[in-house]
Structures are given as C-alpha cells and as structure tokens.
Amino acid sequence: MRHRVKKKHFSRTAEQRVALMRSLARSLILFEKIESSEAKLKALRPFVERLITLAKKGDLASRRRALSLLPDKEAIRKLFTELAPRFEGRNGGYTRIVKLPNRKPGDSTELAIIEFVE
C-alpha cells in the first residue's frame, strides 16, 4: 500500500521525472551552480548527494553504478576526479539551496539556486 508515501510528480510521467533529475544533476555537476524552481531543486538534492557519496568510494563498481544513474561520461569524469576529492572530509551536506525572489511576470514560481558547498 502507498499510504503516506509521497514524492513530487511535477506533472510528469516516471520516465520524464527520471530524465528531469538526470538533466538537472548533469548541469549541476558540470556548472557547479544552477537556478530552477525550489521544488525541483529540493527533489534534486538527495539524487546529487547520493552520486557524490558513490564517487567518494572511487572503485569500479561505484563508477558503474553512477553511470547507470547518470549516463553522461563527462559529468561522471568530473564527479570522480574533481568533486569527490573536494568533499573527502565531509560526510554529507555537499549542496546548499539559496532562495531567490519569486518569478514576477509569469507564474510567481518560487525560484532558488543550488550550488556545491566549498
């Protein structure tokens, strides 16, 4: 039963949600800072933190698992060679979400920025 099991659907099918998370995660890893709606970034945060924890292990199985979650070789290379060593001494909490003013001319969406903690 699905009692009290909640997740954001973003008016998308399951495949579209997976594609959205992969796309946002790829952009965050490559550019290290992205702007989007607050709800999307709150859903993205655990996905990216799981990838960084995998990258900190650094073995072949972790690399293959990360490639299955995020099939982009350039992003995985940066994740394992640049980001994982940066967060070696940190146990979680690799990202920060900073709220921005709402989008005024359109739908008044709550915007935010997600970035890596230095």
Curated annotation (Swiss-Prot):
The keyword Cell division does not apply. It comes from the Bacteria. Keywords: Ribonucleoprotein, Ribosomal protein. InterPro entries: Ribosomal_bL17 (IPR000456), Ribosomal_bL17_sf (IPR036373). It comes from Hydrogenobaculum sp. (strain Y04AAS1). SUPFAM superfamilies: Prokaryotic ribosomal protein L17 (SSF64263). This is Large ribosomal subunit protein bL17. It holds the Pfam family Ribosomal_L17. GO terms for biological process: translation. Belongs to the bacterial ribosomal protein bL17 family. GO terms for molecular function: structural constituent of ribosome. One of its GO terms (cellular component) is cytosolic large ribosomal subunit. Part of the 50S ribosomal subunit. Contacts protein L32.
